[in-house]
C-alpha cells in the first residue's frame, strides 16, 4: 500500500501485504482474485461460507488444504524473482501458503478489512502487528485491561527491545489519552472486550486520539469475533485475533490472525 505515513510492515511482511493490496498485479492473479472475493457488500453468514475462495471449473468446492512446505518452479530464474520480491507466488509455506491466504481473505471479508495474514498464535499476531510498527526507542500507548500474555509482551518482552509503553484505562477520557502520548509514540493498542476482565474498549475514542497523533490503532478482537463487533467500523486500522478461542471453538487448534485496513491508513491522518 502507498501512504505518506508508512508506519509498518517492511521487507517480507510488507511484501506479503502488498501482494494482496497492490492494483498493478494482473486480474488473473490469485491475490487479485482473493481481493475480489472479500465480498464486503454481503451479509456475515454469506461471508463465513463463501468469502475468500471461489473455485473455478473443475476445482475443489471447498478450500483445499495444501500440505507442502515448498513449491515447484521450472527454472532458477523463476525462483530468483520470488526471492528478490520481484514476482508474486509461493515458495515456502512458513511465509505464505494458498490455504492460509484463502482463510485470511475470508477473515478480512468478515472484519471489513483490506487484507489479512494468519499466524501461529494470537500472541504472534499481536507481536507482528506491534513490532513491525515499533523499533528500539519507540513508545506504545496501550489499554491496561488486556490479556495477561499481551500485557507481558508489551511491558516485559518489548521493553527488552527498547520499546516502552504507557498503560491507560480502557474507559480513559480524551484528556487522559492525550496525556499518555509522547513524541516517540508510534501505536495505540487495546482489546475490544478484555480477556479475562471483560471490560469494553472505547474504540471510537481511542481511534480518534490515535489518528490525531498520526499513529494507527491496533485492536485485538478475539472475544467478540467479527460476528459481534468489527473494530474497523469504529476506526481501528489493524485488527488481531487469537483464532484459538471462539473462531476455532473446539479447543483443537492454536492460531492467530492480523488484519489490515488501509484507505489510506491511518484514516487519512
Question: What is the meaning of each model-derived region?
Answer:
Residues 261-269:
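Single conserved hydrophobic/aromatic residue that forms the stacking wall/gate
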Residues 241-254, 263:
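Active-site PLP-lysine loop of aminotransferase-like
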Residues 120-121, 142-159, 196, 224-228:
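Substrate-binding/gating loop at the entrance of the active-site cleft, primarily
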Residues 39-97, 105:
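N-terminal "arm"/small-domain region of PLP-dependent enzymes with the aminotransferase-like
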Residues 132-150, 169:
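Conserved PLP-anchoring active-site segment centered on the Schiff-base-forming lysine
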Residues 170-226, 246:
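Active-site phosphate-binding strand-loop segment of PLP-dependent enzymes
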Amino acid at each position: 500500500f502507498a501512504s505518506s505515513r508508512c508506519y509498518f510492515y517492511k521487507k517480507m511482511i510488507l511484501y506479503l501485504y502488498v501482494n494482496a493490496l497492490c492494483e498493478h498485479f494482473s486480474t488473473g492473479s490469485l491475490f487479485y482474485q482473493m481481493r475480489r472475493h472479500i465480498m464486503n457488500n454481503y451479509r456475515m453468514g454469506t461471508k463465513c461460507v463463501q468469502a475468500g475462495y471461489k473455485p473455478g471449473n473443475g476445482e475443489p468446492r471447498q478450500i483445499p488444504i495444501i500440505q507442502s512446505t515448498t513449491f515447484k518452479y521450472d527454472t532458477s530464474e523463476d525462483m530468483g524473482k520470488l526471492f528478490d520480491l520481484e514476482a508474486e507466488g509461493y515458495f515456502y509455506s512458513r511465509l505464505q501458503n494458498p490455504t492460509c491466504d484463502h482463510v485470511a481473505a475470508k477473515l478480512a471479508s468478515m472484519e471489513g478489512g483490506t487484507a489479512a495474514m494468519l499466524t501461529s498464535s494470537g500472541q504472534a499476531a499481536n507481536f507482528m502487528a506491534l513490532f513491525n510498527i515499533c523499533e528500539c526507542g519507540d513508545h506504545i500507548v496501550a489499554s491496561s485491561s488486556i490479556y495477561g500474555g499481551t500485557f507481558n509482551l508489551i511491558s516485559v518482552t518489548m521493553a527488552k527491545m527498547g520499546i516502552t509503553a504507557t498503560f491507560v484505562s480502557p474507559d480513559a477520557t480524551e484528556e487522559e489519552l492525550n496525556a499518555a502520548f509522547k513524541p516517540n509514540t508510534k501505536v495505540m493498542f487495546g482489546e475490544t472486550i478484555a480477556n479475562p476482565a471483560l471490560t469494553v474498549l472505547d474504540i471510537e475514542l481511542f481511534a480518534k486520539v490515535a489518528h490525531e497523533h498520526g499513529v494507527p490503532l491496533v485492536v485485538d478482537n478475539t472475544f467478540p469475533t467479527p460476528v459481534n463487533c468489527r473494530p474497523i467500523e469504529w476506526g481501528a486500522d489493524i485488527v488481531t485475533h487469537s483464532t484459538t478461542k471462539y473462531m476455532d471453538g473446539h479447543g483443537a487448534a492454536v492460531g492467530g490472525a492480523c488484519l489490515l485496513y488501509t484507505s489510506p491508513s491511518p484514516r487519512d491522518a
